[in-house]
Regions:
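Short, extreme N-terminal segment that most often corresponds to the first beta-strand
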Residues: 1-29, 202-203
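Long, compositionally biased intrinsically disordered terminal regions
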Residues: 113-200, 204
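Exposed alpha-helical structural elements
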Residues: 16, 73-80, 157-160
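Short, low-complexity intrinsically disordered segments
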Residues: 2, 61, 91, 176, ...
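Extended non-membrane alpha-helical scaffolds
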Residues: 18-24, 35-46, 173, 177-180, ...
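Intrinsic-disorder-associated interaction segments
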Residues: 10, 14, 74, 151-154
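Short, intrinsically disordered low-complexity segments
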Residues: 27-118
Length: 204
């Protein structure tokens, strides 16, 4: 099973982002700077909707990535960050077992775009907001077979959408120093990935 949960915040002021996150998430009690890349390997699920463990880094000159341990859309958090920091916030989530993919863009306190699909059940796609200039008629990659046209919105689509905003969805964590925000009661149990045949974030 593979799960991906992340926020991307357009900012060059990482310290201001850290303070905004700490203010918005009362369960966060400790901030630890200059953590190595392998800190990103321990993102275990939170027991409640709000994350209580986050790691962030300035992985792009204009964008910070925040990995967190909540499989929640975090609408209030993303909207609040985009408003308080007067910027854009992108939320991405994916889950391989349920074949679930999520993308949302918040800008200056407004939800501008939201896409949500789950191919393992019959729920309808969420597709709200103005279509981006780079999108097809429907979100995702256009496929044609036997005269039939369909669209697949998956992990590759999430990566491509992020690139359109000027950053890579994934960068090698070992290339950066990370800031850890967590609840002091969080039980740390790092994963042993030395023998993994693929990166921790790739779930197929």
């Amino acid at each position: 099973m593979g799960t991906w949960t992340s926020l991307y915040v357009k900012t060059t002021d990482k310290a201001k982002l850290v303070e905004a996150l700490r203010s918005a998430l009362p369960r966060i009690t400790e901030v630890v700077e200059d953590q190595p890349g392998n800190i990103t390997n321990d993102i275990q699920p939170s027991a409640n909707g709000q994350p209580d463990r986050l790691v962030l880094a300035q992985t792009n000159p204009q964008w910070c990535v925040v990995f967190h341990n909540s499989f929640d859309k975090l609408e209030d958090l993303a909207l609040g960050l985009s408003q308080d920091l007067d910027t854009s916030v992108i939320v991405t989530m994916a889950q391989s077992v349920s074949d679930y993919y999520y993308f949302a863009l918040y800008s200056n306190g407004h939800n501008k775009r939201e896409i949500e699909v789950c191919y393992s059940d019959d729920t309808e796609m969420v597709n709200t907001g103005e279509r981006f200039h780079f999108e097809n008629e429907e979100p995702g990659e256009k496929e044609e077979y036997d005269g039939e046209v369909s669209y697949l919105f998956g992990f590759d689509s999430l990566e491509q959408y992020c690139k359109q905003f000027g950053f890579n969805m994934y960068e090698n964590p070992e290339n950066f120093k990370w800031t850890l925000l967590h609840n002091a009661n969080y039980k740390f149990s790092p994963k042993n990935i030395a023998n993994d045949k693929k990166p921790w974030w790739k779930f197929w």
